[in-house]
From Swiss-Prot:
Family: Belongs to the universal ribosomal protein uL4 family.
Alphabetized PANTHER family for the sequence: 50S RIBOSOMAL PROTEIN L4, LARGE RIBOSOMAL SUBUNIT PROTEIN UL4M
Keywords assigned: Ribonucleoprotein, Ribosomal protein, RNA-binding, rRNA-binding
NCBIfam families noted in UniProt: rplD_bact
Bias-annotated ranges (Basic residues): 62-73
GO biological process: translation
Protein name: Large ribosomal subunit protein uL4
Gene: rplD
Function: One of the primary rRNA binding proteins, this protein initially binds near the 5'-end of the 23S rRNA. It is important during the early stages of 50S assembly. It makes multiple contacts with different domains of the 23S rRNA in the assembled 50S subunit and ribosome. Forms part of the polypeptide exit tunnel.
Organism, scientific name: Corynebacterium urealyticum (strain ATCC 43042 / DSM 7109)
Gene3D superfamilies reported in the protein's UniProt record: 3.40.1370.10
GO annotations of cellular component type: ribonucleoprotein complex; ribosome
Length: 225
């Protein structure tokens, strides 16, 4: 594995130097099963789980026997709130539950590295100096810049939390999703056709990810002892 080099694009259509993408993050073997598990857990955690239905004992009414037991020629009934009646209770209906799944940090980190590596291998990661020049947000400028970078539809823009100008510039673009570097995740990377990093966001992400990798290696060595 060797580090990847990418040009840094500027808003005027030129390039300004290059950056290196560490092979330990952007050139690893992707595990489809692992990424699927992590994405499934992430989507499950977004579910509210507040669905609820009432059984026959919870539905209002139905305490009185609708008609006498014998002599009517009809089938005997004990309550008009039985499940087979309109307005009756639900049998085995959904109840509130927690859909979240436990996913270890190492699995999340490995899945994210695999997703980024896949995008890097297909030349779908881009690095920019700044999305919009100056301090005034401009949706038009942001859209033009992104269209020059890629013709694909779904774009994930990774920024620093302080870059409010860029975040406001892409807020109204329907197929562009902006995300702080510390919230980068497997689902958003895989959902996007292209991933665009600002230089500052890329540096922050690599620094955090490299620190996590060193901690994992240290823990592995200690466990081996």
């Amino acid at each position: 594995m060797s580090n990847l080099k990418l040009d840094v694009h500027t808003a005027d259509g030129k390039t300004n130097g290059s950056v290196e993408l560490p092979a330990s993050i952007f050139d690893v073997e992707a595990s489809v099963a692992l990424m699927h598990q992590v994405v499934t857990a992430q989507l499950a955690a977004k579910r509210q789980g507040t669905h609820a239905t009432k059984g026959r004992g919870e539905v209002r009414g139905g305490g009185r026997k609708p008609f006498r037991q014998k002599g009517t020629g009809r089938a005997r009934q004990g309550s008009i709130r039985a499940p087979h009646f309109t307005g009756g209770g639900t049998v085995h209906g959904p109840q509130p539950r927690d859909y979240s799944q436990r996913t270890p940090k190492k699995m999340k980190a490995a899945a994210l590295r695999g997703a980024l590596s896949d995008r890097a291998r297909h030349s779908r990661i881009h690095v920019i100096e700044e999305l919009v020049p100056g301090q005034i947000p401009s949706t038009k400028s942001a859209r033009s810049f992104l269209e020059r970078l890629t013709e694909r539809k779904q774009i994930l823009v990774v920024l620093t939390r302080e870059d409010l100008t860029a975040r406001k510039s892409v807020a109204n673009l329907p197929n562009v999703h902006a995300l702080p570097a510390d919230q980068l995740n497997t689902y958003d990377v895989l959902h996007a056709d292209d991933v665009v990093f600002s230089v500052e966001a890329l540096d922050a992400f690599i620094k955090a990810a490299s620190g996590a990798n060193k901690a994992e290696d240290q823990n592995t060595k200690e466990e081996a002892k």
